[in-house]
Swiss-Prot record:
Residues 496-504 are cytoplasmic. Glycans are attached at residues 54, 66, 69, 422. Residues 24-474 are lumenal. Its EC number is 2.4.1.-. SUPFAM superfamilies: UDP-Glycosyltransferase/glycogen phosphorylase. It comes from Dactylopius coccus (Cochineal). This is UDP-glycosyltransferase UGT4. Belongs to the UDP-glycosyltransferase family. Pfam families: UDPGT. It is found in: Microsome membrane. It comes from the Eukaryota.
Amino acid sequence: MTLLRDLLLLYINSLLFINPSIGENILVFLPTKTYSHFKPLEPLFQELAMRGHNVTVFSGFSLTKNISNYSSIVFSAEIEFVNIGMGNLRKQSRIYNWIYVHNELQNYFTQLISDNQLQELLSNKDTQFDLIFIELYHVDGVFALSHRFNCPIIGLSFQPVLPIYNWLIGNPTTFSYIPHVYLPFTDIMSFWKRIINAVFSIFTAAFYNFVSTKGYQKHVDLLLRQTESPKLNIEELSESLSLILAEFHFSSAYTRPNLPNVIDIAGIHIQSPKPLPQDLLDFLDQSEHGVIYVSLGTLIDPIHTDHLGLNLINVFRKLRQRVIWKWKKEFFHDVPKNVLIGEWFPQIDILNHPRCKLFISHGGYHSMLESIYSSVPILGIPFFTDQHHNTAIIEKLKIGKKASTEASEEDLLTAVKELLSNETFKRNSQHQSSIFRDRPMSPMDTAIYWTEYILRYKGASHMKSAVIDLYWFQYILLDIILFYSLIVLILLCILRIFFRMLTK
């Protein structure tokens, strides 16, 4: 009888500690069809599903795990600049790149809106969501989804937050020491660099307000055409942005102020290293002088980098180290014996192998974070967008070096040999790795907590700054400055009149 009573009490107590939350309906909207944007945060969506939430992912890729309450809607539209390759972009100015990428994404999203599956999702009145994740990357028309489903939005930034989204949510952005992510600067800028940073940042803001919003408004109208809602403008809809989950960490960039609704989750895509396939493990274990891992990202078309590729191959011929290179085999016919080429390798698992001595990368933000996490020095060869900014940070932290895509074979060989022989780079990498890993909560737990926080408090409007309700001239106190200037001017005029009267 006592045993039965104890079991009953244990059962009642266990019920008290069961999480009473009911699974919410979450829509993940990832319109840009780039795998490097989909793969890093998929573990977050999987974890939300495993916690009981119903997660629907609208993207260009199929899900990698089969979970009962985790479903996908896969679209087939392609971004034009991905189809033609990114090689030509590196030859253009940064303003040209900004405008080009913006225009291509605008045209692409106009086509994406007509996707039959998306239209079916929007027209089904029985479909409801409690929260929407959206990718913050030049496709702000998707803010209209918050009105259609009457729910808050969490923005996903796959790099340090772009200034336009900092301004949308009220996060302070000071040009004097916060560089634009598309510029090759760090937080320590000379006078001329600060001028360039301010001009470029103001240009992108003006472009957003006077050009981009017109395209976004068109997308809003198209998305809401099947609803009976009155015409809404993009400025009103952007207020539904409740939180930003950003892949940014002060140790891997620079220190900057953030509002409480801008959350750092840098490294969320990094999972514990897994055992390597036997052939790769043997290749690494048997490398007497270590291994160099090479990956130039997923968007770099080899046809636009043949000069760089040939120079790298010739450099590798002269090294004692073995090389694992993620590339297309058909572009090289005479591959050295110390080089293993394949179209895919488990990057984080290779970087964490003790024999991995150097990472040659395009300077992508995720690659930089994985290099820091794994304590591996990096040679960055940037092509476009934020990659120049990332490699500038690499040099600032002294965990690697930067090389041009047009670098000669001799220059590349010199840089590689210095990174392999100078132990300072390795020590700095280990130090940065220690700082990067030292956090009170893992990036995954942080993202889950704040996602469910927004769900609990229905958008958590109490976290929003009053700055989002100010005009730009109020934010920079221009009206106050003009007011006091006017008072001073009036006083000077009065004094002038008074002295004239005295001198008569």
